[in-house]
Amino acid sequence: MGDNQDMGKSFLETVKFDDRGLVPAIVQDQETGKVLMMAWMNLESLQMTLDKKRACYWSRSRNKLWLKGESSGNMQVVHDILIDCDGDTLLLKVSQTGGACHVGYHSCFYRKATEALSMEICDTLMFNPEDVYGKKS
Amino acid sequence: MGDNQDMGKSFLETVKFDDRGLVPAIVQDQETGKVLMMAWMNLESLQMTLDKKRACYWSRSRNKLWLKGESSGNMQVVHDILIDCDGDTLLLKVSQTGGACHVGYHSCFYRKATEALSMEICDTLMFNPEDVYGKKS
């Protein structure tokens, strides 16, 4: 068991990036425990997050560093970064400004499966994305 | 915004599996909000989870279905399954028997980064894995 804890290694040595050089980061509200989103980090974005204490991810769709909130203002102040037993998933405890989700909800997990396997909204709309990101053309 | 919510689709139609046919599932304690682990599901394990209301994953290391707790007894009763805005991450709200982590902790996220970028234990040991899984040869 002691071996599995890897406590002799540094935090950055313990992180296992996948074959794309990415690691998933679960993002949780520090105070309420609500899970807000999951995003991906490469080493550069993780180092920037550790340095600035603001969540920074790797955008797989835009293929670039993504300082959370740089467009929307909805920043995440990072209090703690935890790592799982296998070293291949991170958990960020944050204070979220506004909503985390680009659709306008507080959490990206704003829909849940019903018994009949349709979906229902289970979260609060925080902003109108057209006001924040502009209208889609 | 309405388009992004995809509320006209069924839950299963909304899930986007990756190129390996897998989707990550974050697992959170239903009562306390503690994040316990992240695992991966394929369609079969997701359908089994929906059917049995017990968490079932796809083990990438063993390449087979993995009914959580089948070896350890540490089952997860599933209360709700949420899906994120992009449809590519799930969030399970569960009641966890014993510890979720094979190392013996309540959560797989039992280590956190310190200011000096070493790690410290931040969780409770629930069982001795040698008692549960046997000694490693």
Swiss-Prot record, chains A, B:
Enumerate the InterPro entries for this protein.
PRA-CH, PRib_AMP_CycHydrolase_dom, PRib_AMP_CycHydrolase_sf
Entry's EC annotation: 3.5.4.19
- Any note on cofactor binding? Binds 1 Mg(2+) ion per subunit.
- From the UniProt record, list the reaction(s) this protein catalyses: 1-(5-phospho-beta-D-ribosyl)-5'-AMP + H2O = 1-(5-phospho-beta-D-ribosyl)-5-[(5-phospho-beta-D-ribosylamino)methylideneamino]imidazole-4-carboxamide
Q: Listed GO molecular functions?
A: magnesium ion binding; phosphoribosyl-AMP cyclohydrolase activity; zinc ion binding
Q: Which residues bind Mg(2+)?
A: D84, D86, D88
* Quaternary structure note: Homodimer.
Q: NCBIfam families under this entry?
A: PRK00051.1
PANTHER family linked: HISTIDINE BIOSYNTHESIS BIFUNCTIONAL PROTEIN, HISTIDINE BIOSYNTHESIS BIFUNCTIONAL PROTEIN HIS7
Q: What is this protein called?
A: Phosphoribosyl-AMP cyclohydrolase
In the UniProt record, the gene name given for this protein reads hisI
